[in-house]
A protein has these predicted regions:
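Charged, compositionally biased interaction regions
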Residues: 1-202
Length: 202
Protein backbone atom coordinates (compact mmCIF):
# COMPACT_ATOMS: atom_id res chain seq x y z
CA UNK A 1 0.00 0.00 0.00
CA UNK A 2 1.36 3.38 -1.01
CA UNK A 3 2.03 5.96 1.69
CA UNK A 4 0.98 9.60 1.55
CA UNK A 5 3.75 12.02 0.66
CA UNK A 6 4.07 15.79 0.80
CA UNK A 7 6.58 18.19 -0.79
CA UNK A 8 9.43 19.58 1.27
CA UNK A 9 9.53 23.27 2.10
CA UNK A 10 12.99 24.09 0.72
CA UNK A 11 14.05 21.04 -1.34
CA UNK A 12 12.42 19.64 -4.45
CA UNK A 13 11.63 16.18 -3.09
CA UNK A 14 8.66 14.49 -1.42
CA UNK A 15 8.70 12.89 2.01
CA UNK A 16 6.28 10.67 3.98
CA UNK A 17 3.41 12.83 5.23
CA UNK A 18 3.26 11.16 8.66
CA UNK A 19 6.97 11.49 9.44
CA UNK A 20 7.75 12.47 13.01
CA UNK A 21 10.25 15.13 11.87
CA UNK A 22 11.65 16.25 8.53
CA UNK A 23 14.98 18.08 8.72
CA UNK A 24 15.90 19.88 5.50
CA UNK A 25 19.37 21.19 4.89
CA UNK A 26 22.57 20.82 2.95
CA UNK A 27 26.12 19.60 3.41
CA UNK A 28 28.67 22.01 2.00
CA UNK A 29 32.01 20.76 0.60
CA UNK A 30 34.96 21.00 2.98
CA UNK A 31 32.82 22.17 5.90
CA UNK A 32 33.50 20.02 8.96
CA UNK A 33 32.78 20.44 12.64
CA UNK A 34 34.51 18.97 15.68
CA UNK A 35 32.27 16.82 17.88
CA UNK A 36 33.18 15.24 21.21
CA UNK A 37 34.36 13.86 23.38
CA UNK A 38 31.10 11.97 23.79
CA UNK A 39 29.89 8.65 25.21
CA UNK A 40 29.54 5.59 22.98
CA UNK A 41 27.39 2.44 23.20
CA UNK A 42 30.03 0.32 24.96
CA UNK A 43 30.37 2.61 27.97
CA UNK A 44 33.47 4.60 27.00
CA UNK A 45 34.09 8.13 25.75
CA UNK A 46 35.20 8.71 22.16
CA UNK A 47 37.83 11.31 21.34
CA UNK A 48 37.01 14.43 19.37
CA UNK A 49 36.12 13.65 15.76
CA UNK A 50 35.47 15.64 12.60
CA UNK A 51 32.08 15.27 10.95
CA UNK A 52 30.53 17.00 7.92
CA UNK A 53 28.60 20.12 8.92
CA UNK A 54 24.93 20.23 7.95
CA UNK A 55 23.28 23.62 7.55
CA UNK A 56 19.65 23.16 8.57
CA UNK A 57 17.20 25.21 6.51
CA UNK A 58 13.85 23.96 7.74
CA UNK A 59 12.30 21.57 10.27
CA UNK A 60 8.72 20.34 9.93
CA UNK A 61 6.83 17.65 11.85
CA UNK A 62 3.47 15.94 12.19
CA UNK A 63 1.00 16.79 14.95
CA UNK A 64 2.27 15.76 18.38
CA UNK A 65 5.53 14.29 17.06
CA UNK A 66 7.75 11.88 18.95
CA UNK A 67 11.48 12.60 19.01
CA UNK A 68 13.44 9.36 19.07
CA UNK A 69 16.70 9.53 20.96
CA UNK A 70 19.09 7.39 22.98
CA UNK A 71 21.53 8.20 25.73
CA UNK A 72 24.80 6.35 25.18
CA UNK A 73 25.96 4.72 28.42
CA UNK A 74 27.13 1.46 29.96
CA UNK A 75 25.27 -1.53 28.49
CA UNK A 76 22.59 -2.66 28.65
CA UNK A 77 20.30 0.11 27.43
CA UNK A 78 17.92 0.67 24.54
CA UNK A 79 20.57 1.31 21.89
CA UNK A 80 22.22 -2.04 22.58
CA UNK A 81 19.00 -4.01 22.30
CA UNK A 82 18.07 -2.32 19.01
CA UNK A 83 21.57 -2.70 17.59
CA UNK A 84 21.89 -6.45 18.18
CA UNK A 85 18.68 -7.40 16.36
CA UNK A 86 20.07 -7.04 12.83
CA UNK A 87 23.32 -8.73 13.91
CA UNK A 88 21.39 -11.75 15.18
CA UNK A 89 19.29 -11.96 12.03
CA UNK A 90 22.26 -11.56 9.70
CA UNK A 91 24.32 -14.25 11.44
CA UNK A 92 21.43 -16.68 11.86
CA UNK A 93 20.55 -16.47 8.18
CA UNK A 94 24.15 -16.96 7.10
CA UNK A 95 24.83 -19.87 9.45
CA UNK A 96 21.61 -21.76 8.71
CA UNK A 97 22.35 -21.77 4.97
CA UNK A 98 25.61 -23.62 5.74
CA UNK A 99 24.84 -25.53 8.94
CA UNK A 100 21.23 -26.78 9.31
CA UNK A 101 21.92 -27.76 12.92
CA UNK A 102 22.13 -24.10 13.97
CA UNK A 103 18.87 -23.35 15.78
CA UNK A 104 19.32 -19.78 17.07
CA UNK A 105 21.79 -16.94 17.52
CA UNK A 106 21.70 -14.56 20.48
CA UNK A 107 23.91 -11.48 20.72
CA UNK A 108 24.05 -9.88 24.16
CA UNK A 109 24.16 -6.10 24.76
CA UNK A 110 27.91 -6.53 25.41
CA UNK A 111 28.35 -8.29 22.03
CA UNK A 112 28.90 -11.84 23.25
CA UNK A 113 27.57 -14.32 20.69
CA UNK A 114 25.64 -17.43 21.81
CA UNK A 115 24.89 -20.00 19.09
CA UNK A 116 22.35 -22.70 19.96
CA UNK A 117 22.43 -26.01 18.08
CA UNK A 118 19.48 -28.33 17.52
CA UNK A 119 21.66 -31.38 18.28
CA UNK A 120 23.30 -32.47 21.51
CA UNK A 121 26.71 -34.01 22.02
CA UNK A 122 25.56 -37.50 21.07
CA UNK A 123 23.86 -36.33 17.87
CA UNK A 124 26.42 -33.90 16.47
CA UNK A 125 27.88 -34.87 13.09
CA UNK A 126 31.48 -35.14 14.34
CA UNK A 127 33.42 -34.66 17.61
CA UNK A 128 34.76 -31.20 16.72
CA UNK A 129 31.42 -29.88 15.49
CA UNK A 130 31.30 -27.04 18.03
CA UNK A 131 34.64 -25.70 16.80
CA UNK A 132 33.39 -26.01 13.23
CA UNK A 133 30.48 -23.73 14.18
CA UNK A 134 32.88 -21.23 15.80
CA UNK A 135 34.85 -20.96 12.57
CA UNK A 136 31.61 -20.55 10.63
CA UNK A 137 30.70 -17.55 12.81
CA UNK A 138 34.07 -15.90 12.19
CA UNK A 139 33.75 -16.64 8.47
CA UNK A 140 30.17 -15.42 8.12
CA UNK A 141 29.33 -12.83 5.50
CA UNK A 142 29.16 -9.22 6.63
CA UNK A 143 31.39 -7.66 9.27
CA UNK A 144 29.82 -8.90 12.49
CA UNK A 145 31.09 -12.46 12.40
CA UNK A 146 34.73 -11.55 11.92
CA UNK A 147 34.64 -9.05 14.80
CA UNK A 148 33.03 -11.48 17.27
CA UNK A 149 35.24 -11.46 20.36
CA UNK A 150 33.42 -14.05 22.48
CA UNK A 151 31.44 -16.88 20.84
CA UNK A 152 29.81 -19.68 22.84
CA UNK A 153 28.15 -22.71 21.21
CA UNK A 154 25.49 -24.47 23.30
CA UNK A 155 23.24 -27.48 22.85
CA UNK A 156 19.44 -27.62 22.55
CA UNK A 157 18.96 -28.02 26.31
CA UNK A 158 20.58 -24.64 27.09
CA UNK A 159 18.51 -21.48 26.71
CA UNK A 160 20.78 -18.98 24.91
CA UNK A 161 18.60 -16.10 26.17
CA UNK A 162 19.41 -17.00 29.80
CA UNK A 163 22.94 -15.90 30.71
CA UNK A 164 22.84 -18.03 33.87
CA UNK A 165 22.19 -21.18 31.83
CA UNK A 166 24.98 -20.33 29.39
CA UNK A 167 27.44 -19.74 32.25
CA UNK A 168 26.32 -23.01 33.87
CA UNK A 169 27.00 -24.86 30.62
CA UNK A 170 30.47 -23.30 30.40
CA UNK A 171 31.18 -24.26 34.03
CA UNK A 172 30.04 -27.87 33.73
CA UNK A 173 30.81 -28.79 30.10
CA UNK A 174 33.93 -26.89 29.04
CA UNK A 175 37.61 -27.56 29.62
CA UNK A 176 39.58 -24.51 28.41
CA UNK A 177 42.61 -26.44 27.19
CA UNK A 178 40.57 -28.62 24.82
CA UNK A 179 37.30 -26.81 24.17
CA UNK A 180 38.31 -23.23 23.38
CA UNK A 181 39.84 -21.53 20.36
CA UNK A 182 41.76 -18.25 20.23
CA UNK A 183 41.07 -16.66 16.85
CA UNK A 184 44.45 -15.22 15.87
CA UNK A 185 43.14 -13.73 12.63
CA UNK A 186 40.01 -12.05 13.99
CA UNK A 187 39.38 -8.36 13.51
CA UNK A 188 38.83 -5.94 16.35
CA UNK A 189 35.50 -4.23 16.87
CA UNK A 190 35.96 -0.58 15.95
CA UNK A 191 35.09 0.73 19.43
CA UNK A 192 37.03 -1.87 21.42
CA UNK A 193 39.45 0.18 23.58
CA UNK A 194 41.54 -2.93 24.35
CA UNK A 195 42.34 -3.64 20.69
CA UNK A 196 45.95 -3.12 19.57
CA UNK A 197 46.31 0.25 17.91
CA UNK A 198 47.69 -1.30 14.73
CA UNK A 199 45.01 -4.02 14.43
CA UNK A 200 42.51 -4.15 11.62
CA UNK A 201 38.98 -3.17 12.54
CA UNK A 202 35.55 -4.18 11.35
Amino acid sequence: EAIDVVPCETIDIEVPARSEFIIEGQFLPNRDITIGPHSNPIGYYDDEQLFPLMEVQCITHRDEPIWYSTMEMMPPFDHNYMAVLPIEGELLSDLQTKIPEVNDVVVTPNLSYFVQLSVDGAQKPHPEFGKYVLHAVWGASGRWGRTAKIVVVVGPDVNPYDLNEVEWAILTRVQPQSDTIINQSGQAFLMDPSAPKDSSHG
